[in-house]
Amino acid sequence: MELFWLEHKKLWRKKIVKICVLLCFVYCVIFGSILSFQWFGFGSSDDYTSAFGNNFDGYTVIKDSQEYALSFGGELTDETLQQIVSDYQQMEADGMEEELEKTDWQIVNSWLGTLYPELRDTSNYKTMISYVDPDKLTGFYERRQQVLDEFLEVSGQVGAEKEFLHQMERKVEKPFHYEWVEGWSTLLGSMVADLGVVMALFLGIVLSSLFAGEWRDNTSTLVLTTRNGWGKIALAKILTGFAFTVELFALLAVSSVISQLFFMGTAGWDMPIQNIKLIAVAPMNMLQAEIYEYAFVLLGAIGFAGIVMFISAAVKNNVLTLLLSLAVVYGPMMIAEYLPYEMQKALDLIPLAGSSTDIFRTNTFRIFGKLIWSPYLLITIPVWIGILCMPFAIKSWSRRMKA
């Protein structure tokens, strides 16, 4: 334990570590959460001369939007959808531009495009919600089921796989609970979902020197002569790397959640994720989805940390270690679209290379003849990869030190 604390203090004393933590916090929390809520994500846009085209009044807009959504009764039915669309068209006709900003028009418009494609007027430059006849918006859940079936057929998900996904979907409570959706859509679609990708960059910078830095700093001789030996020191370094990963995640996650609670409160936590993507099959509400996404980031970051430390132990050069580490995450993202679909799914299992937004998709894996929903593997396989890298890191470090 003493060695661990020494290594932990040694890591945090480095100026580059403090700079990385600060930059990561500024990017993910200040810009990615606080300013996104208050300014360029939800600020009103009547003043197009302001930065990002938005005003610095996101808090007020969010509260007004939540209050407006509550006026529709809390359940999403045909009548609710008709009322939402009719109300939007009336406000637009009355020139109430500011009032339109508190509506869920982007979400509702996506529903219309998905469920009522025959009502789309290609000659009309306006969005569907502006011109569609509200009286024709019937059969919401029947149409959703039809669209889901068609999507599965087109995706080649038939037979046992289709039935497996239908069994999941049947657990989704209907009618859907409805409150303001746009905030949760942004939160789950980008704010939390992108956290891991950003963390990977800074984890790579910090942890790449954990082992390789000993050669640069000419401390390898000291390690050889210490009474503790390479084995205990290697373990202390690995535990330090994992501890730093958890600490960085905790700093970002706790700060982001506090920001979220300040701006959005808890309103809408029990809405189904189907309000964001209609053909999602997971029986999850917004809170459960957020917990999953944070778990995805944490476990993926731990897995990635294990890989970085293994590379650092095997490679003497800091820069090469960093480049190889970043290639693990960003490489699959760059080449995935050029690979077969099954290969893309396999690459998603690499720590932080996949996406927590798979909860909105219908991807599955077949392992030993058993179908498994992809999000389950996306939070378990990455962390196991990181753990399995530990003995290899120690072995690589040992081989180099003895040489």
State each model region's role.
Residues 21-25, 319-332, 350-351:
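Central hydrophobic cores of alpha-helical transmembrane segments
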Residues 224-230:
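Short helix-to-coil transition segments within interhelical loops
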Residues 18, 231, 318-320:
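Residues that define the loop-to-transmembrane-helix transition and helix capping
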Residues 217-221:
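Hydrophobic transmembrane alpha-helix segments characteristic of membrane transport
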Residues 5-7, 11, 310-314, 381-403:
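Junction motif at the cytosolic side of a transmembrane helix
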Residues 26-83, 133-214, 235-314, 318, ...:
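Secretory targeting signals
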